[in-house]
Amino acid sequence: MRFRLIGALSMGLFLSIVTTAAASVQQVTTPEQQFGHEIGADYELVNYTELYDYFTKLAGESDRMTVQDIGLTEEGRPQVMAVITSPANHADLDRYREISRSLAKADGVAEVEARRLAQEGKAVVWIDGGLHATEVLGAQQLMELVYRMVSRSDPETLRILDEVILLAVQVNPDGMELVSDWYMREADPQQRSTRGLPVLYQKYAGHDNNRDFYMSALAETTNINRVLYREWFPQIVYNHHQTGPSGTVLYAPPFRDPPNHNLDPLILTGLDGIGAALHGRFVSEGKGGATMRSGGSYSTWWNGGLRTTPYFKNMLGLLTETIGNPTPIQIPFRPERQISQGDLPLPVEPGEWHFRQSIEYSQTANWAVLDYAARNRDHLLFNIWRMGMNSIERGNRDTWTVLPFEVDAAATDLGGGRSGTVDDYRRLLQAPENRDPRGFIIPSHQADFSTATKFVNALLKNGVDVHRATMEFAVDDVTYPAGSYVVKGDQAFRPHVMDMFEPQQHPNDFAYPGGPPIPPYDNAGWTLAFQMGVEFDRILDGFEGPFELIEGLAEIPSGVVVGAGAAGYVFDHRDNNAFLALNRLLADRRQVAWLLEPPVGVDLPEGAFYITANQVDRSRLMTLAAETGVDFYAVVAPSGETLRLRRPRVALWDRYGGSMTSGWTRKILEDFEFDFEVVYAEEIAGGDLRSRFDVLILEDGAVPAPNGRGGGGASAGASGVPAEYRDRIGSITADRGVPEILDFARAGGTVIAVGSSARLGYYAGLPLSDHLAENGRSPSRTEYYTPGSVHSLKIEHDSPLTHGLGDRLDVLFNNSPLFDLEPGAETVGVTRLGWFDTDTPLRSGWAWGQERMQGGTALIEAKLGDGELFLFTPRITFRSQSHAAFPLLFNGIFYGSADDEPIF
């Protein structure tokens, strides 16, 4: 009888489990029912409108899923996020989100409490798709993932739903709509292709949308960062990409060296753990072709991508790069990829490959990550707390970050590979003056505090805790005014804080001794505080003060209007927002002067802008001051030399398909309210630019090399291009475009040539030569290599073009040209305005052979006929980050079109 009772109880329990599982399954719409085909069908792509509708429908059909609009895109579309977990978890979602936040921020959470919360909480996993829109797999596999999560009832899926909260996010809606529609526009499936897009697949950045995450300049990035670092704090962030290395199917973590030196070691071991789960699942399912580490170029060095920025918030950022296209492809035969090895456990045979296979590989990867999170839920939750607490503790004591250049110097000091003593270690790697800062203070009395506030907002968007001084205070015998910003190191996101303020030191990384350098994944150095020209103090000891935590974002303090009843008002050229105020005044049809000498009666340097009192009401200035943060000072009429400013007619070069460098410049011009038109190669080659424009901006990549390489036929591919885009086809060449650009300048126009386009100076016949060449030979990469890094320029104040700049300027330099001015250059109107005056110009990153840069000229003003050429070889508009260099662009726009007629 007892056995029967137990058996009956067991049967009842079994029936309960089956009933519960069955009850959790609703009849949901399949992709075939919604779209008429399965996800990944040959020659088919779903667009974003269809994805959005499908997610909305599934959310209405399933109690496992809700959808949220996390913000608008740059083109105004709602950006959708699906939140998927068990119905029971949905009922307590706010509690689980708060647990995730508490453990990630760590502050005030003791270890005992952290362990308890780790047991109570749920793992939060972010999986996205579609960031790089032409990598079409990401967005398509996301729909398959969401469908499977709300429709499957197998034990693994139910366990994942119980233990994990999945955030499934389309991260580039505009791009998905563009690319899918472009592919599907052809009625004949055999003619469909994602190639030949007429515009960037993100309004401003294109592929660079995955380079914006520490700056957060784009709408989509800001939406994503808010969810990741201010709301949900996922332990895992999985970013889908394409394509896999040739001869494989996909690349997955772990990643190659070097790691960033600010990262917690648990990031590296955590990536190894998830990587093992990923590769183990592929092998167990017989899905070959998954490679890792040396199989690709991906590392954990760079900050700034959707995968990499999470590392600096103690989150495990994952990336897969997977082959596949709705048009079937071939896996090529690569003999070296056919032998099993540590970084490629199971090779894949070459042959035809269909998109549906890529969808299945993506789901294997998704389920490996979700299963890992479910099985290791408490470890993930506790470890994010542990990493956060490690950061807090490091920020509260003396610590030293061991950096490559210091290690190299220590090895040289010891000599010949000899081992040293503990005292040597402390002497060479723990000198008191080299310890990590406990925090950073950004004084509010700096001239360009508006840009400093924009820097602080980039930190805040990334979840960093920033304080504001409520009154004057002193640290280390230095007095700081109220309103100064304080960023302390004793916080969970300390790795990001250090990475934004401190220089990066990329190790010397070569294929073999004496061999070529191994290019870093993206930039080698990027210190944002340097790029933005923020003035700050490093504080090496603990400090306190009258500080309040900033909630939300920081507002640029309202400017003031000082004095009245004078001849006019001046405002400071050193404040980048002065150009915003200037453009608004000019849009009001007010006359503004540029003072070439310091104004009388106010402590401002040369370059201040002046407007007469009869040109503007004081109330209008008060409004501008409140809107822009710019201060206006009443002064007597200037007596020195001035330039009259007018709203210039600006042309910005672009190309068919979109230039990312031009796209970023377009955003900068819009942000500062410049009027401009975009022009293309055929319009430039048509001549007569001068009748329509005063200024032409040629961004990096516009001008071909003087040897004739580059450029393209004006009619190439025109037959496949919609009529409204055909006037954009073609490239500037030495024969078509360059002569017309030079004619534009000679006729009185201003040409601003940035980055590689500065070689326009050679075409103009300016007395320039290649500074880096020796005896006509350019150095090899084993002799000289400067991947994207921050370098320090010496600025010469011999022209209004450098007004607003200090004596030194940090610029992003990426194997850019460097010039020598030939003797007598100044007599023909060619002036050096910025150059490398030391043999160690590197500020942040990597520059092999940097001593070769010494003496090289990077900023040039040149007279050409009645007009001017401004040659800026650094990337002065780099990804909307290099605010410190923006005055070069803005000055160039206004200076070239100004005249010397007085306005008073």
Each language-model region and where it sits:
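N-terminal secretory signal peptides that target proteins for export/translocation
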Residues: M1-F3
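Intrinsic-disorder/low-complexity accessory segments
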Residues: S24-V164, A205, R211-D212, A217-A219, ...
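Acidic, glycine-rich active-site loops and adjacent beta-strand->loop/helix elements
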Residues: L131-A133, V169-G175, M215, G244
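Divalent-metal coordination cores built from histidine and acidic residues
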Residues: L161-L166, V171-R211
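N-terminal Rossmann-like NAD(P) cofactor-binding module of classical short-chain dehydrogenase/reductase
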Residues: Y238-N239, I697
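Short, solvent-exposed turn/loop segments enriched in Gly/Ser/Thr/Pro and often Arg
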Residues: A168-N172, Y183, N239-G247, S757
